[in-house]
Amino acid sequence: KKGVTLREDDRFPCNAGNCACLPLDSYSYTCQSPTSSTANCEGNECVSEADW
């Protein structure tokens, strides 16, 4: 994975069932529903807990 993140450990930052999106204009993850658009996310992806 490329990019710099502000996470200080490897715990998944979102609730179960949500996914982590890294906005193009931010270095901190936001959580969103897996059905939400990923157009504003780095790599156009929202990372699920399974893929974290």
Curated annotation (Swiss-Prot):
Residues 1-6 form a propeptide. Expressed by the venom duct. GO terms for cellular component: extracellular region. Disulfide bonds join C14-C31, C19-C41, C21-C46. Keywords: Disulfide bond, Ion channel impairing toxin, Neurotoxin, Secreted, Toxin. It comes from the Eukaryota. This is Conotoxin Cal9.2b.
